[in-house]
Every structure is written in structure tokens, then in C-alpha cells.
């Protein structure tokens, strides 16, 4: 139709009706200022909250009063001038009057480079453009919103600022990349918002949280919170300079795994920064690994069903609080590892599921897209936008929060299409195989980007199968992880210590088999949260025997673990023999430290960490077969095993484990050199709650060949204990 000066003819009736119904997919074609270049200027506004609308020019001068078209609050009218110009709007409703800038007068938010990178699936700093960003455009303060929803008919940003009315702030669609964007003047940090989306058939979906929000309401509330890119005052330059050397294969890495909500209940991020950092420093751990911090709706998932992959959970305070926690740990010389969950996401209505009315982030076929074990959706790793979203999430935590490492959860479920599925319940890959080729490419891509963009940061795989080369470089055909959890070692050794000592002589292989494959990957030895939940009981509860034997067994186990090749990981509470199975709704039982047995266990773990860090023989060759040597793995009859840990130019450490409750006197063990040796750690020492049997004072190696070595020691082996001996 021809544009005239009559207000009712400034815009087609069908467009007016669609705007008022909230179904128009191209609001910038209708709303805002139109004309210029020889055509009359007009302004169209949808403001159902107003009775009158006027257009203001420079200095607040009223240029035109717009005419109301219909009963739903659509206003239009001509304004003087030949070319478009900045303007404001004045609204009147009864006794109330207010002014605001028109969102529909501002230019596009995304630039050409953004469109190109989004189209390529290589916008690795996606979080700098998508999400909600406080911004100033043309001198006006507000918030820029952008969200990917390519199949939506209409997307609006809603919040208290527009009475959660999806008709009032519909967004512009960037057709080429499927991103909807809008700059809303006058909004501020802290404002709540969601997206109202109409699906491909026009159906109104449940309100959605922003997939790239940097802050969320504390659950059970589900709104996103306007919050700029995390900005923190960092004081960790010293740590950042040393980080690469602190996380190499030859560095001592001893990880304390923590659930932030139950280490000590009631602590926010700042209180954790003070109390947790001091405790970890006291205990001598090199790193803290947090169970997922990403925002998650269900507390009982422990964070492993996240929705806010760019937002630290609000349960413990604002995002800045989490940054301060990381900063404090770094200042105390402690690295930070985050559990990161790219394998799957929950089906909560406000999350990623059915985001734009389609299976946008997952697969439509449940044989590919639904995980029955967890009732979650599986990401479509083959879709470049989804892979880009996840890669950007990984890089975000390293970039904006100075996180040092990501422990990638449930990698096995990503690698295999038939994971936890029977025949006929999965779809083979293009070669007819069971490997998820898209997930493999995705993991390699993430690990390469971490290596290239954040040198010194590492990734760690929780991977429970024999998939090859998980921790080998991508260029060598590997997946590119820095380390892999050794689930087989954990399963075998924990099973051994559950056995009555009388039967252990038949199961020595459970302790020795791990060395057959110990160097096939770069391993972390994990005694994680998974081993103290779901009816398994606590670590101390799983040990065989009466109370004395349980404590002795766990002390011996820890000694064996810290002497064994591989980096160390221990879940909170294990260090002082928490007796109750872990409960995410309750604090650890710190009162147990009033008991000498529990206090002794804690002291042992601290001393193990001290020895592990201090002695290169115990860590420098963790990932090199030259750093380990069996002395005697075959004395199964006595349930004794002995081995050396070595490093070039350093004193070796002899570890001897006696895993029955029998003292063995004058037990001869071959050693590589004569001279004086000394016992440097004994898990049966009285200070740890043991019976104090051992080898005080010096030990003189005799020139008696034994176990194929030129000299030997005669040792007293304490019951159910591990000892460390080294040349004096």
C-alpha cells in the first residue's frame, strides 16, 4: 500500500494485527522510524501499557503525538524531517508519564565478522556477543540481547520491565545465522529476563532461560540475570606465570575433590575462599576440583545436569564471588579444576530442551538424543553451532575465571553410540561402527582450542573404557586430554581392600595389574565422590575388618596410592575417614576430628602430600615407565608387595605394603644400593592412629643380594601398613 500521512495507513493492517498478537517475525520492518530518502518519516510504536505516545526530538521537544490504532496499544504517526534521526518517546498512562528510547531505532548488534564466525561454527568467544551484555549504543545505556533460535517464528525478551509480555520486545532475526537480537535501552545489571519463543508452527513455548547468561536466579527460580562479562580484580599473576610448570606430566598433582555445598554447609563463595583455601593449603593438596559449578536446577544432580553453562551457580553468591574464590586459591598456590559437563543436558522446560520448538541442541531420534540412565538429552555434537556453543563454554571458564583445568564428565558416554544401549537401540556411525565420530571430533576440537588459546591449562577425562590414546596429542591420533582418570585401578584396588585379609593372597593381581597398563595413558588415580554414594558407603566403611583394621587398611591404601605412579585425587571427607556415606544435603562430619583415629588419618594424608611434593622420585616420573621398578610383586602368600619410585639424579623411594594384620620381622627386601637407608613414612605410626610398629632410626643395607639387587634391607613390616624407605 502507499504510505500517506494518515496514521491508520502508515502500516498494513496485517502487520499491526501480528504485532498486537505477538506473532510478527520481523518487528523492525514495522516498528521504529521509517521513511527518509525522500519518503515521509513515520514512527510506529507498540505500547499496550500507554494511553498516549509522543515523539521527542533534541532537547525533549515534542515533534509529534502518535495516533492510537486499534484497541491494543499500537501507535503511529508522521514526524517532520527528511532523514532519520535519534529520538525518544514520551508515554502517558493516567497520572503517570515517563520517557524512554525506542529499541527499534537502534542498528544491528552483531557485526559481519560475528555472522561469519557463527556461520563457520568458529566463534570461540561466542560469549562476547550472545547473551545479555550491558552496552552503550549511540550514547544510550541499555542491554544488548542475542540468542540462537533459528527455527523460531518469533523471539522476544521478557522481564519485569515489560510485565513479561512477549509482544512488547520482539527481536530482530539475523536470517543467515538464526540469531535473534535486540538492544533494550534503560535496562541494567541485575534485571531479570527470559526469552519468549514461538516455535515453527507458532506455538508458544515455556519461557526460556538464556543459554549464555552469565548469572541466573538462585534455584528453584529460573530467570536469567543481566550481568556483563565477568570482570574481577585479579591478584594471581604469580600463579598464572607458574601454572604451566605446576600442571605438567612431571609435576606433583594431588587433587582435593569438593562439592561446594556440603564441604561445610552455609558458606558462600567468599567464605569458601577463606576456609577452603586455608584447609587445602594445610593439607598440602596442589589442586581443588569442584563438582560442577555451572548453574543447575536440581541440587540432587550435584551439578551434573547443568543448564547455565556460562553461569556459576547462584546458590553461593554472585559470579564475582566465584572469581574471588579462584583468585584466593591461586594466591595460596592452589590450582582450580572444574568439572565440566558437555555430554548431556536436562529436559527442564526452561532449558535447552526443545529450545526453539525443535531438537535444536540434541537429536530428534531418541536412539541418539536421549540418555536413559540419566533421563537427559544428548548434545548433537555434529551440529557446528552446538559444538561451537560447548567449545565456547569450555574456553569461557578458562578465560573469564582463570580456571586451570576442566575435568570432562562422562566421556565414555560420548565416545560410544551404544553406551548403555542394547542392540537395536542405537544408530551406527557412517562406517557402521559404534564410535561417535562427531563426539570424537568435538573432544579433539575442544582440547586443541584449550591448548592453543590457554597454554598451561589442561583437560582431564573421566573415561571408563579402554578407548585408546585418550591422553595423547591430537596430532598423534589421540583425543588430546592432559590426563585420564584410571577407573580400572580404582575398581581393582578398592575391591582388594574390601576383602578380608585372609583371602587377599589369592587377589594380589588386583594391586599389581594396574602396572601392566600404567603408561598407556597419563593417569589420575581417583577415589572420587562416585565411590561414596548410592549405597556404597564411605571409604572407611568399605574397608575390611573391625574398626582398628578398617583404619589401618585405609591408611595402608592411601600409602599405596600415593606411592603408585599417577596423579592423585581424593574426595572430601576421605582424608579424615568420614564414616557416613556422602550426603549432598549435609556438611561433612567435622566433629570426627575430635577422635584421634580420624585426626591421625588427616595427618597421614597431609604427610603423604608433603612427601609426594617434596620427593621428585614420587612424582617426576609418574607418567614414565623409567620411574617405576618392581622389587617383589610376587609375595602373595604374605600379601606383601614392594616397589621403587625413581627419578634421574634423585634418591629413590622404596614402598613396601604389608596387607595382612601380621607383623613381619626381619623381612628381607632387595635394594639397588648399599649404605644407610631410613624410614620416612609409616602408615602404622602412632601419630596416625597406628600401633607404632616400624623401623625407627637408621637402616643399614647389607651386601646380601636379594630380589636381583646387589644389597638388601631387613625390615620390620607393621601390620596392614605401607612404609616408605629412602637412602639417608
From Swiss-Prot:
This is 1,4-alpha-glucan branching enzyme GlgB. It comes from the Bacteria. Belongs to the glycosyl hydrolase 13 family. GlgB subfamily. Its EC number is 2.4.1.18. Keywords: Carbohydrate metabolism, Glycogen biosynthesis, Glycogen metabolism, Glycosyltransferase, Transferase. GO terms for molecular function: 1,4-alpha-glucan branching enzyme activity; cation binding; hydrolase activity, hydrolyzing O-glycosyl compounds. The active site is at 409 (nucleophile), 462 (proton donor). The gene is glgB. It holds the Pfam family Alpha-amylase_C. GO terms for cellular component: cytosol. NCBIfam families: branching_enzym, PRK05402.1, PRK12313.1. GO terms for biological process: glycogen biosynthetic process.
